Amino acid sequence: MVSGLPPGSVAGDTNSTAAAIEFAVETLRVSDIVICGHSQCGAITALLDKKPVSDLTPHLRDWLKVASPVLETMKKDYAHLHDPAERETAAAEENVLFGLDNLHSYPCIQERLAD
């Protein structure tokens, strides 16, 4: 996953992400970008459990803010899942899709897809 960060959302981290994406797409001319998720993700668990902000590290707090649309998708589309492991799996998969949407927000990606 491209860290779930849309361009301009968090200084530093976003600049690094944007620079890496731009370099890969424009300079290296990569043909594919792989977005990965993983099981037993502590950040996904924190997102679903709505941990108190004071219990979280600053970077995790930032990540959870960016990933909040995943929580909304879970509420809307996955309310029928009650097993915590199934909910975590669904949220991890939705987070990868969210990362893909974010990747498409980068101008260099939009230009490449239009080619």
Language-model segments: residues:
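Conserved functional hotspot residues or short segments at active or partner-binding sites
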Residues: 35
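Divalent-metal-activated hydrolytic enzyme cores
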Residues: 2-31, 42-115
